[in-house]
């Protein structure tokens, strides 16, 4: 409905250009918003106020001219001017009912699909050789929810798990394995089963022994030179580390697979060419022995240019080098229209610089969109980054296990007579969903406080509340036998039916925001509002005890659409639904 009103306004603006009311080359981003007050209609635009300056007319006069020029539409019951020149649209109830009717048998719930694009999504991307920790949660689940929404809307999505599988940490691990094998022979392999402790011990040796650190750096050079022994061990480290990652992904219900892994090492062969190409274009400068690029747009507080370091004085490459190689690959090989990077907000300057440089060096097509969709940090209840009681990093697997234990206690307290197998399965879904939803429901760019107590509450905008809301709606159909809604028609008579219908009709608009802005929190807010709208409808409008069959079937269709929308919305967030709780 919103896109329909936008189309009417676009046609009106085109007519204004033809009549000379506004300049022919005038470009306006027409904004149509949902109204908060029903007395102001369903949708509103400030187009008249946007045109005031170029048209040389006062906004209320322009608003009336817009209304007079609008093409006729069966969807619009009436149009009014409000305040200084807002235009309010009242949607025809029968048109809304028709829109909902079309959604009933449509797998996309009546959503008009956009023109499909190829979208590369870079997310999760942990450094290997260590277990995943809570710092990896946000990129992993925010990226995955946006991927799901993109695919649902018909886009071709290419997941890229740009793991940190190269660099100094591997020299450290190789040197430590070398020491262990010198002492214990092949038995040293067993110590790799606990990768985290193995890494910690190697790091301790690296920090304490200059001789060990020198050997570690030497092994990095040997690894990069293709030494067979070093490469064999490196592959073992990676395989063990990736196995840990995919155990976590499976538990989180994240859609990444081994086939999506395209880490730093995948671009090793391209890095030298990146340097040569930048040099050939005259973009490289030498600074303290390193090869760097300075761009006029990037300066520090003192006004000094900020470098993008491409190659260190010792010949080593940096993140910027592999990122540039990856961008070129994603543009030229993957043919991406958009590339989305779900990486911590603290990397904002890095991405601004490399995006700018990639365009400047023509490593990427001009029409390819590079987007850093950064996020804030997950903090403990003290407001500081989330840590263990001893101050260490919290392993993601430990966090999920605690969520499961707490969810099991909660579910058992509410269902003392339920069998253990059912309790365990419900707790698994509730625990994981609570952790994911608590994160996804927060604005991506904000920091947030992690609280098990809040996220496991059955009140407010939480996963348990929404999971229960879904079971409540779906439960209506368990009380109906021989249900046949094939001939049923949606009719919106009661005010609460209209409110629910209006909310259901917004699903497509919400998903557009999720994929355009990378903002799953707007979907969470929508699902919470939808659950509330259904609750108000259910209290005011008897469904199974409706006045007649036509009314009952209409309300059953509204309930069915609500259940499907809640389920689809939660699934797009990567959250399973339950049939009972």
Curated annotation (Swiss-Prot):
Enzyme class (EC, first level): ligase
E.C. number(s) listed in UniProt: 6.1.1.19
Chief localisation class: cytoplasm
Motif interval(s): 'HIGH' region: 126-136
Signal peptide stretch: none
CDD domains in UniProt: Anticodon_Ia_Arg, ArgRS_core
Biological processes per GO annotation: arginyl-tRNA aminoacylation
Keyword entries, A-Z: Aminoacyl-tRNA synthetase, ATP-binding, Cytoplasm, Ligase, Nucleotide-binding, Protein biosynthesis
Entry keyword Aminoacyl-tRNA synthetase: yes
Location within or outside the cell: Cytoplasm
Molecular functions per Gene Ontology: arginine-tRNA ligase activity; ATP binding
Catalytic activity: tRNA(Arg) + L-arginine + ATP = L-arginyl-tRNA(Arg) + AMP + diphosphate
Any one GO cellular component localisation term in the record: cytoplasm
Quaternary structure and interacting proteins, as annotated: Monomer.
Family stated for the protein in its record: Belongs to the class-I aminoacyl-tRNA synthetase family.
Protein name per UniProt: Arginine--tRNA ligase
Taxonomic source organism: Shewanella baltica (strain OS155 / ATCC BAA-1091)
Gene it is expressed from: argS
